[in-house]
């Protein structure tokens, strides 16, 4: 007797079902059930919900099992995962680390750390934001274009204003988009491209350049470029990317870090609407239910709507101290 793990429909050996060597598809709900339940543990959907911690709350103890470099990315991001790298590493399954897929690459701090440490063999980055994509593409293919500008005069408030205009225009060259995004990210409050300059619109040059470190940026850019043969890059809508490319790597993990549910519109150029969050949830859970392939780890700010959107996910909570800084 066979029983669908999703809708509990039962079948006997005489029923004709779509199946493969590992399991079968239910003709009622289209869900896939493994013959051996232990196989399901290799194909998780784990939702990590970030809760805002108070200053007096006890810090989570993260086991130090692997030395990971956390500052390889040239980008600064609100909600970036550099501070959670050690914690996230403990959530990864060793048998699913041949390929690591970042569906919303952003600063890609987790993937870069894993690739640098030799934990993964291949890193796949996707980001729909033209500026983010342009920067990664330029770092991988023609980093000298960035380095030449880094070696030039220190950027000014006017340079930042022009960079933001380039990002808004949608018609710049790949090189100009990449440089403009790097400038806007490094010189704006908390790395938010939409935010005011560091130190304010009429602030000092010293305040504006407080997070501008050409030497360190050059080192990071060159190091990432040195790993280019192990990095694949895409510029696609998240759902299209998952269904066409990202999800179908065997022995892999898809790391899905969408724009924040509550603050996303204030923080990102490519933010999500309510409908976008819902569409992503439907896409992810449909893949998980019908075609179990890659491990999927999803991170979100904790909100009742997000919990309701992911009934199929194993939900865990992580306490995080959020801050918007210079």
Where are these regions (language model features)?
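Residues immediately within or flanking Cys/His clusters that coordinate Zn2+
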Residues: 1-4, 23
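Short linker/helix segments within small regulatory modules
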Residues: 15-23
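Short, cysteine/histidine-rich loop/knuckle motifs that typically chelate Zn2+
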Residues: 6, 28
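Cys/His-rich microdomains that often coordinate metals
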Residues: 11-12, 33
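SAM-dependent nucleic-acid methyltransferase catalytic core
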Residues: 55-91, 140-255, 259-265, 279-282, ...
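Short metal-binding segments enriched for Cys and/or His
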Residues: 29-47
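SAM cofactor-binding core of SAM-dependent methyltransferases
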Residues: 98-167
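Long, positively charged, glycine-interspersed low-complexity recognition regions
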Residues: 261, 271-326
